[in-house]
Amino acid sequence: MENSELKQEVRQFYDQVGWVQVSDGVYQNARYEDLRPVSREYITRCHARIQRHIKPVGSYLLDAGSGPIQYPAYLEYSNNYKKRICLDISITALQEARNRIGDHGLFVVGDIAQLPFKDGVFDSVVSLHTIHHLPVDDHIPAYREMHRVTKPGCPAVMVNGWDNPPLVRLLNTPRLFYRRMQTGRKNKQQKIARKLDEGKGTHVKKYNAAWLKHELSRYMDVDILVWRSVNVHFLRFYIRQKFFGRWLLKLLYGLEELFPRFFGTVGAYPLIVVQDKKESKRE
């Protein structure tokens, strides 16, 4: 499938399914997050990790692949900025984002691998769960583009996913066995959603931390930390209120805080911070 066709498929899914509200403030895309009370504190604290790495105050924050800015913690990233620039491939996402932040935002339909902005115009850039929807050939260009549009010395902060990382592989074995026991027919929209969920149809392959550092380090400094070390499948399968679910997640969060680079490398979702290389000029 050509790159343009892959991007069109992603746009179609989010315009027609993913960013359609199924109830007040809850989107169809909520299937990709664990919104149960037992997981809420852990999820919210992970969302808040982004804010540690962006500039606390600035003029312009770019939210690349903003979606509808669907979680309260996401809204807080731009609290001390004059404007939040929301860029997304989905017009539905941007309409929902406008409903949430109004005049605080500017809204642009665009491709994060070809940002329509001049060099060095943003005080910080954030991008959550967007790069993995791109064709694989666009992954490194997307990182470079987000670095390009930040001001010198300012951070771009991205959350993405690894390809079957060790911790997920270890913990998910029982769940995957159970899933293989299940059968059922899917309609067309469910098939598209499944492709996006499993990372098929949106790129040819994923990668690991070593590969990403190798590809990016020639252009910029890269720090890989933990955003969240377990995925939604793990949370829904293992975490139960009556089996000390909250306590287990508090323990997991504490370990992530103690060893952020370890869990960022072996866990599900890394928090990737890129900035200018020290003592060097941009290419």
What does each model-identified segment do?
Residues 1-54, 70-74, 155-184:
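Conserved class I S-adenosyl-L-methionine
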Residues 210, 214, 224-283:
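A C-terminal cap/extension of S-adenosyl-L-methionine-dependent methyltransferases
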Residues 195-210:
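Acceptor-substrate binding/catalytic loop of class I
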Residues 129-130:
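Short catalytic micro-motifs in class I SAM-dependent methyltransferases
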Residues 140-152:
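A short glycine-rich, Lys/Arg-flanked "PGG" loop and its adjoining helix->strand segment in the class I
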Residues 126:
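A conserved beta-strand element that flanks and buttresses the S-adenosyl-L-methionine
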Residues 62, 67-114:
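Class I SAM-dependent methyltransferase SAM/SAH-binding core
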